[in-house]
Every structure is written in structure tokens, then in C-alpha cells.
Amino acid sequence: MLFHPIYDEDLAQGSYLIGCQATGEAIAVDARRDADTFIRAAEHHGLRITAVTETHIHADYQSGSRELAERTGATLYLSDEGDADWKYGFEGVKLYHGSEIKVGNIRLTAVHTPGHTPEHLSFLVTDGATTENPGFFLTGDFVFVGDVGRPDLLDEAAGFVDTRFDGAKRLFASLRDHFLTLPDYVQVWPGHGAGSACGKALGAVPSTTVGYERVTSWWAPLVAAGDEESFVTSLLEGQPDAPLYFARMKRTNKAGPALLGERPALRRFEPSELQGRVNDDLILLDTRDAERHRADHVPGALFVPEGKKFATYGSFAIDPDADERPIVVLASSEAQAEWMRDRLSWTGIDNVIGFVTSLEGLTAGPVPTVAPAALDSVAEAQLLDVRNANEHRAGHLPGAMQLDVSRVAYRSEQVPADRPVVVHCQAGGRAAVAAAVLRAKGWDDVRELEGSFDAWVAAGNEPERADDAPEPAAAGA
């Protein structure tokens, strides 16, 4: 048996390619839209993908299961568990609790593990050539390293009301009946790692075991003791802000993501062709680092720095449901522009049409900033903290309103437009993304706090802190 994890740090997301080397067949589980990655991995190992499945209707990225099945001719398997609200809107072989997928000598057994979502399946993997006992458990967003999947996303991002409580109770039962009953040696391979918003305390190692979670996780003693009430309270308390693009992902992944197929070549624009069009009939994505962006900002351009969180920050800055204008990215080459287009498609942003390699000649200027020492001189300023709610509670500038960077583009009406707005995060990275969004949406006076919260504290200022806040987190972006 070949077991090949395919992990992406941007989305903190894990996919899996599992193959039977005796027959040359393979199955992909929880694939992203970059189908070529999975096809190349299979070919590298002398395998062909004959089956594709996923653990649940994802909220944080656009599923690539349908795309990969279409590209390879593989059979697509989908959960048919859960209530009528969460049935897939496209065709696939239906899976239920106990259903089996066979790939050569490999057997995947579906285990219905509701809680994170009603239709959620996990997969026990057995290498039938050597044993009849499962050795791997693909848990999707059911169990992570050190944590479990949050049950509140249908409320937070999909418009449902109070499903979190029932979801938490279902998760308790799934852990009791389907996880803790497994042998300690079973390896657990989850759908996400540290950095994902699908849980609140995900570990940074790629996998764990049933036995390790039984001994070390916060939840196992509560489940073993039958203490559902304490489990529900602990699980729901302190969950991070759910990015609002999750609602769009849920909706499109349920209905059926659009098939990308063969994508057209990107057009190379000259800077002069963009003059007067930025934030008019097209979106310009400034992908430089924050320092260069602040030194030479094109009015109306959005800021999404090229790097390991490109797809994530892109989904924060752009809502394709509300803005269908074509996107031009700033890139050093056509190859880099194609990489950016592919990454943005992972969160359903499919309207990148071209790229520009320079901003020379475009109207540009420095981003307005204010030093911590000069903050009081900005009359009637609204301080905007774009860190998450837990960071804000742990310590914030007096009078600052909190709106997570992932929500600014979707809830900008909550930010006053009749006075100066001073944006900050922990160290400045997220603030630059959020400030550019507000400027593009028409806010006249948006400034960034130089060095953000870290610099303000370093200048000797005392933050306010919620009475029940945990200890402040370490400095970060």
C-alpha cells in the first residue's frame, strides 16, 4: 500500500493519495482543485486514480473532487448521510455508514461521524494484502491533532441558527462511539493542521494516533467520563472568527463546484493599459510585500501579498459573489501569475484574466500611516483591530472596534466612513490587507498604525484586556 499525504500550508489542509501497488490503482481523498498535483503524484508512483472521495462538504476551500474525477475518469463517491439540507447537488456514488470503497487490495470503510457537519464521513483504511484490521483513519474535520472540528460553522458562516449545540452533542457521540472504540495503534490523519479556522487548537504535526489522543487531548477525559455538558461548553468556548467566505464555499461545494477544465492563457497587460481602470472595470491585485506596497500604492488596488497565505488572504479581500470584475495580478512572470490564478481558484476566485509585471507609470503614492506616538493627534479616529476576537480580548487598544480581517470585505458597513479609520493588527500584515479593502470600497481616510499592536505596546502603552481573556498570544502578523 502507498500512503501519500499532500499537504498545503496556505490553507493548512491535508489531502491523501492512497494506492494499491499490486494493481496500480489509487484513490484521492479531499482533493483541492489543482488536479494536476494529484495526477502527477499518482503517475510518479506508477498509479492511476480510479476513485475520488471526500469527507464532507468543505467550508474553507473549493473542493476539487469533481474536477479530479472528471479529469481522470475516476468514480466519484459522496456522502449521502445527514439531513436534506446537506445533500450533494451533483452525481456520485452514494456512501453511508459502513459503505466500502475498494481500490485493488485497499479497503476504505465509511464511518458516519457527524458533529462538524451533519453529512461528515471519516474513512478507516485497511491494507487487505497484509491484514484485515484497519491501520489508518482519515478523519477530515472530525478529529485533528489535539483538537476536534468546530460544530458552529453552519451558524457562523452558512446562515443557520443554533445548530452548534446539536452539532457539539453529535460530535460527542461520534467521538464516544466511533473514535475511542478504535485500537490505540490506529494512525489518525486529519484534514487540517495548525493555522486552520476549522478548529481552535490544532496541532502543528501532521498526524497522531487514537492512543495518543486518548491520553493527551483535552476532550478525551470528558468523553470517557460521559460529561457531555462540559464537553459542549469547552468546545464552543473561544472558537476563532469564522471567515465569511466559508458561506460561499459551503454553498458551491454542495451544489457542485464549476469545472475549470483547460484554462485560457493569461493576458499580459502594460501598466498604461490599467491607467483609469483600476477599481473601475477591473481589480488590480498588488502582490508585493507590505513594505513595497506601503511605499508605492496604486489607489483602488487590493493588497494580497504573494506568499504562503496567498489563497487565504485572497479570499479575505475578494468576494466574487459581490464583485464579478476581472482581476489582473502583479507578477514577476507569466508562470508566477499562473501560480496566483491557480491559488485563488482554490477558494473559488476564478476571474483572473491577466497580469502586469510593473506598476511603472501608474498613479501611485505612499500609504497613509500614523506612528503610535502620534495616534492621539488623529482627531475622532476610529481604531479598527482586524485581529481575531480572541486576540482582541487578550489585549487591545482602548476604544478599538474589532472586525477580523477575513470579514472586512463582507462587513465593511460596520466601519464608520465619516471619520478617519486607523487600522492595526498584531504586527501589520493583516492590517495592510484590510486597509486596502476599505480604500477600494471608498473610505476616504484610512491609515495604518505603524508597527501595529506590537509597536504600540513596545512604546509603553497599556492595552485593555477582557476580564476572562486568556494570556496574550505571542507576537505575530
Predicted regions and their residues:
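Divalent metal-coordination and catalytic microenvironments
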Residues: 18, 30, 56, 68, ...
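Rhodanese-like catalytic fold shared by cysteine-dependent sulfurtransferases
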Residues: 88-89, 150-152, 164-165, 212-258, ...
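Short internal beta-strands
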Residues: 50-53, 75-81, 329-330, 355
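Conserved beta-strand hairpin/beta-sheet module of binuclear metal-dependent hydrolase folds
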Residues: 1-48, 69, 123-140, 145-146
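Metallo-beta-lactamase
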Residues: 23-24, 36, 40, 44, 50-59, 107, 117-239, 424, ...
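Active-site metal-binding loops of divalent metal-dependent hydrolases
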Residues: 31-32, 57, 81-82, 117, ...
